[in-house]
Structures are given as structure tokens and as C-alpha cells.
Amino acid sequence: MAKVQYYGTGRRKKSVARVRLVPGDGKIIINERELDDYFGLETLKTIVKQPLVLTDTLGKFDVLCKVAGGGYTGQAGAIRHGISRALLKFDEELRPALKKAGFLTRDPRMKERKKYGLKKARRAPQFSKR
């Protein structure tokens, strides 16, 4: 018999996370590694757990996640987005709480491109009057 699974895709900056929620005891596996092994910073671990804590589902699901692209902060945000979307597949009544917390919104902020004639996206070379 097939297990019940809930899928969600999350994105943030250049990161894309494919998240599966499987009924279990609360393990969070990211790219075949435990949450504590994958993210060193406590703030990133907290970001990943936020939707589960908000909806009181922290011990009910195992989170299996494949994430690629970007840095650690972007990946943590993408996982949070993916978990939130997967929770909606589990129970649509969680939508108001998740939406109010802002977990369903795809953060549109991206790195601004570097322009020619400038050192960075907006940083101009030093100006000399004489």
C-alpha cells in the first residue's frame, strides 16, 4: 500500500526546493542529510521549522527535501516556502494562518545585476574633481 505524501515546491532567490511531507515522527532530511548537519546556523534551522511550528504539525510529518541552487539563506527560505505549500495540500484550512505569516508569498527580491561602468550593481567608481 502506498504511503500518503504531500508535495510542495518552494523558491527563494536562486534556490529551488522540492519538499515531500510523509506522516512520521518529525525528522527533517535535506539532500540526504539531517537538518542539524545541513544548516549550521540556528536561525536557518528556525526558518525551516517555522511553518510546522505555526500549524502545530512539527511531530506529525517527516520532511524529505531536495534543494539546489543559491546559498544557505536562499535555500532555507525555499524550503520554508515548499513546506508551507505542502501543508496546504494536507489541509486547506491552514491557508489563513500561513498567508498571514507570509509563508505562502514567493519573495520576489533577487540579486540586482552588475552594470557596465560601475563596480557593482550601483556602486560607482570613486569620483575625482581634479
UniProtKB/Swiss-Prot annotation:
A Pfam family reported for this protein in Swiss-Prot or TrEMBL: Ribosomal_S9
UniProt-annotated stretches for the region Disordered: 105-130
Compositionally biased tracts (Basic residues): 111-130
Keyword Ribonucleoprotein part of the UniProt annotation: yes
Keyword Ribosomal protein recorded: yes
Molecular function per GO: RNA binding; structural constituent of ribosome
Keyword set, alphabetical order: Ribonucleoprotein, Ribosomal protein
GO BP term (any one): translation
Gene3D superfamilies: 3.30.230.10
GO terms for cellular component: cytosolic small ribosomal subunit
Record family assignment: Belongs to the universal ribosomal protein uS9 family.
Stated name of the protein: Small ribosomal subunit protein uS9
Organism listed in the record: Acetivibrio thermocellus (strain ATCC 27405 / DSM 1237 / JCM 9322 / NBRC 103400 / NCIMB 10682 / NRRL B-4536 / VPI 7372) (Clostridium thermocellum)
Gene that encodes it: rpsI
